[in-house]
Amino acid sequence: SSKRQRALEAATFTFRINNVSLSCLTHFARHRMQSIGIPSLTLTDRTRHVLPETIAKNADLKERYCEAFKKTAELYNELKQAGVCEELLAYVLLSGNTLDIVTTINGRELLLFMKLRSCTRAQWEIRDFAIDMLKKLREADNTVFKFYGPSCFVNKCTEGPMTCGRAAEMKEFFGNLK
């Protein structure tokens, strides 16, 4: 890790990230040193939603889960037809509804983002996005981004007693990530 991280601020990268749940969006929004484009919630397609793997594996749960989004979309349409204003209709979204975002972020903030968001302790959805972003960064410039990944890969784990205990496995995984 360089002591001259300010040089990383000169490099910026823009990502279009599709199918980000509203729940995951809060994790992206916590990174203040970025320019993030979020579409109006009034334009969100209420039929689009994330499907967690654990729910997808259980047919009954999957059916009930998808039905909740369908019913919410129906309620939205009923409220809209009843004249409820668009701004209030944003409240008829579920945290699993998805939208597409665009973010521009510099190399220094990306280092912090990857340390936090590619960690096994990160929320699963943002971790998947972070790993996909890291693959693209390594394609663009592997000489710099081969050093990016979770804290345990970059230096040492910062999770203290909450550590996953898999630092060696993570060093191998992120060391071989392409």
Question: Language-model segments: what does each one mean?
Answer:
Residues 1-178:
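A conserved ligand/cofactor-binding region detector
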